[in-house]
Structure formats: C-alpha cells, structure tokens
C-alpha cells in the first residue's frame, strides 16, 4: 500500500515560450511531496522517432516519483506539439536553457533544486546545458552518442554527474566510453549496464533505479 501511495503522481501538460517558439512540456509531480526537487528530461533524436514519450524517460520519471522528485520532460522545437523546426542540435541547447529558467520559477516545485537528464541525442543537450548554467545542480547522461560525448570532459561540467552506457551500444564501445568518462571532473559516477544496447529494452527498471538513487543523493 505504501508503494502505491509513493508512486502516485499528477501530470500536467504545459506550454513554454522559447523566443518565438512554443515548447510542449509534461510536468509530473509526486502527490506525496510538497515543493519537490525536479529533473528536466531531454529526449532522443526525433529523426529516429524520439520524443518525450520514451521507455527510458518513462522509467526514469516513475523512479523519481517514488523518491519524491518531480520531472519536467519537454519536446524540442518541431517535435510533437512544439512549434518551429527541429535544429539538429543547433538550437536545442537554448531550448533546454529556457526550460531550466522556466522550471526555476514553477510554484509547485523547488526551483533551487533542479537536475537534468538526457538520453541519446538528448544527453548531448543535457551535457551542454549543465556546462553553462549553475541552476542545474546535478546531471545524468544516458547513451550519449560517442562523437558528441567526446566533445565534453574537460573542466566545464562541475556538477555531480552520472554517466551511463550499455555495454552493447552499437555506437559506443564500452572501453572507449570508460576512457572518455574518466576525463570528466569529479564528482562523477560511471555505470556500464551489462547486456544493454542503445535502447535499454528490458533494462528500464535497472536504469530507473540508478537515476532515482543518484538524484535523491544529489538534489
């Protein structure tokens, strides 16, 4: 029964203005918490069907709710009900910063305790956002594309970070992922999920548990 209570949440679709673009977002808040911390979520590449409705984001959000943490997923420009044209990474970083700014002012969450999570293409955007704003207190990168991941890792991301990759990711040999992860400043946690490929099918609960525990400890 207690598990049932702890997993209850309220979902609300909201629109966020980003310049002349309107972004569609989904705010999910735990009903058992007052002004909880919140994790922003960046989705995979829409050219491969990515949006806020995704197995990795779903499992992460469910796990966070059980920990008393809200989530705010948003569709990048040109995706779902978000207006504009998808920018292939050129404008999505600024969309993320707009959403972070918006989240810091939402009454029902604690705007001083914001985290960010990104999956695949979205992980690159989350890393970019975390490198330029102190409003994000911790961040999670899941299956960031190798080429994008390799552009980070110097001192620019000072927040606690959890870096995750499957050992069967078609894009990223786990040995190279481990090597590149070592270039990130501490505090950092590196997790290679044995048996998981880029899509984490069948590994959602394990992933959600990693994400929930990390944000519970860092927000």
Explain the meaning of each model-derived region:
Residues 96-159:
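Primarily recognizes the serine-hydrolase "nucleophile elbow" in alpha/beta-hydrolase
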Residues 16-109:
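Serine-hydrolase catalytic machinery in alpha/beta-hydrolase-like enzymes
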Residues 157-158, 163-165, 169:
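Short beta-strand/loop motif that positions the catalytic acidic residue
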Residues 201-214:
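Post-His helix in hydrolase/transferase enzymes
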Residues 3-15:
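A domain-start/cap signature at the N-terminus of enzymes
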Residues 172-181:
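Short alpha-helix in the alpha/beta-hydrolase fold that links the catalytic acid
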Residues 183-199:
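Catalytic histidine neighborhood in serine/cysteine hydrolases
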């Amino acid at each position: 029964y207690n598990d049932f209570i702890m997993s209850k949440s309220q979902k609300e679709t909201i629109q966020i203005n980003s310049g002349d673009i309107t972004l569609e977002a989904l705010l999910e808040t735990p009903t058992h918490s007052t002004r909880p911390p919140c994790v922003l979520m960046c989705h995979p590449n829409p050219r491969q069907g990515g949006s806020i409705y995704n197995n990795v984001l779903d499992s992460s959000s469910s796990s966070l709710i059980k920990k008393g943490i809200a989530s705010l997923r948003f569709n990048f420009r040109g995706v779902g009900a978000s207006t504009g044209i998808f920018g292939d990474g050129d404008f999505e970083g600024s969309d993320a910063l707009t959403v972070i700014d918006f989240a810091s002012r939402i009454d029902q969450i604690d705007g001083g305790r914001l985290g960010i999570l990104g999956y695949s293409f979205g992980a690159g955007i989350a890393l970019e956002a975390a490198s330029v704003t102190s409003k994000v207190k911790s961040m999670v990168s899941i299956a960031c594309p190798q080429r994008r991941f390799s552009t980070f890792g110097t001192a620019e991301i000072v927040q606690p970070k959890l870096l995750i990759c499957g050992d069967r990711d078609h894009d990223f040999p786990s040995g190279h992922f481990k090597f590149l992860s070592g270039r990130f400043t501490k505090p950092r946690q590196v997790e290679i999920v044995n048996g998981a490929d880029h899509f984490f099918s069948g590994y959602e609960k394990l992933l959600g548990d990693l994400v929930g525990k990390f944000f519970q400890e860092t927000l």
